[in-house]
Amino acid sequence: MLDLLCPVCGETLVREERVWHCKNRHSFDVARSGYVNLLPPSASGKRHGDDKHMVAARTAFLSRGYYDHLIGAVAEACMQLAGPDACVLDAGCGEGTYTRAIYDALAAKGGRPQLLGADISAEAVKRAARQVPEGIFCVATTARLPLAAESLDLIVNIFSPFMAEEFRRVLKPGGYLLRVVPMEKHLIELKAVVYDHPYENPPFEPAAEGFRLMQTQALRTTITLSSNEDVQALFLMTPYYYKTGAEDQKKLAAVQSLRVTTEFLLAVYQPA
């Protein structure tokens, strides 16, 4: 059973219609799109994570199939790692594209997976809740998840902050953690357009305290972006956009197509 915990007192939350509440009478309304905000009180009222422009860009880009090879690999890995009725967390779920694929893959095994999507961006979680109405979605930080200890069979962590201690706390003994990270040459051609001195991503460090690495899978391919809209969407959905000055951002304005390297690593862990 996947139980949410109150971010104020830590007691179990119960849902009644459109409100989650605990026995200490702390209550949290469910938004019209289906998610609940469970950020700690100290973080309430602040804007966190991806903004609506970044979320819209990622939604548009992924809807065009450019990363379908990765989405398929994630879904296949989840089918191998989790049972049909597993309790699963998509930690840093974003707008829900991968979450949708994860749910469908597990449901295809004939069960009813309990899937929680958590992200610190309310804009992202809003879209995710609409994409996957079968799941539970909350605005939350992965540094302090509103979940009981040892409550999950599988954690999926895609391009999001990796919180080893917290993930270890909420994962069951014998459970699995699937982590997806970009490799060194990921999007190097995009960087070459924008930067005078394009740089590779740092090598992935597989060690994770409290976990043992079970297996890895590298996905390397090239994609051809067929319009300036897609080029801009890819750039906007990455962290590079907000780290890049206005003049360098303008360099993409004339690029109508671009062949880009994608390099991903899927790493599977179990609690040590």
Predicted regions: what they are:
Residues 1-48:
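N-terminal auxiliary segments of SAM/dcSAM-dependent transferases
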Residues 143-154:
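A short acidic, Gly/Pro-enriched loop at the edge of an enzyme's catalytic core
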Residues 50-73, 77:
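Class I SAM-dependent methyltransferase Rossmann-like catalytic core
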Residues 87-89, 94-144:
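Class I SAM-dependent methyltransferase SAM/SAH-binding core
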Residues 191-210, 219-272:
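Conserved Class I S-adenosyl-L-methionine
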Residues 174-184:
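Conserved beta-strand signature within the Rossmann-like core of class I S-adenosyl-L-methionine
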